[in-house]
Curated annotation (Swiss-Prot):
Entry-linked PROSITE patterns: SAM_MT_TRMB (PS51625)
Keyword tags: Methyltransferase, Nucleus, RNA-binding, S-adenosyl-L-methionine, Transferase, tRNA processing, tRNA-binding
Top-tier EC class: transferase
Annotated residues for binding of S-adenosyl-L-methionine: G70, E93, I94, N129, A130, L149, S227, E228, E229
Protein name (Swiss-Prot/TrEMBL): tRNA (guanine-N(7)-)-methyltransferase
Amino acid sequence: MVANSKESETLTGASAVTGLPQKRFYRQRAHSNPIADHSFNYPARPEDVDWRSLYPSMGDDQQVQFADIGCGYGGFLVTLGEMFPEKLAIGMEIRVKVSDYVIDRIAALRLKNANEATTYQNIACIRTNAMKYLPNYFQKSQLEKMFFLYPDPHFKRAKHKWRIINQALLSEYAYVLRKGGLVYTMTDVEDLHTWIVSHMTQHPLFERLSDEEANADPITPKLYQSSEEGAKVVRNKGEHFLAIFRRI
């Protein structure tokens, strides 16, 4: 699989002040139908993924350990890169313009911070459908952390099967997560939160962290405002519903 990081290209719509891409040039609808037949270039198996094209500075023994599923415009992914410079984190986004924005954003951050302590060489984004192709990218027990932040709630009952958390997909997540690995979920929709907690706690390979454990995690405070969607919820004085689960 050839992955294009676009670092050598001129960034379309980049701000003359910051050098970073501007979201107004990458607007797209809030969600995309995960069941529709989108056209994706995906690997046949994890061994075929050209990770070095995404992480030029990665070591020979390094693997991607963090996955931000439905990473949106990449705000939380950037935060992960800053918090864990020694870890490789991937953002997976189904919307073409949004994934283009994140790819361009990372390229601009790498260029701008080439001589800084944080170079953003440890984060990358790919356009894919994680509901279909996750096992094509990751080996068994490869991931340490997975993030599902403000996923599409699919309000209509007939579309609940499209929700990113369901019993069938949880078995795939358990496959790519190592034992002791964590799944972080955050939403501003209480009904979806209830759905997530119900399905995760019913699955035999996941257990929910206690409030004390969740609050002690250094990532937890970042879940509320690091992503663009989370920041919007804060601006609108909405509620956040957090649940973190451990792979057992």
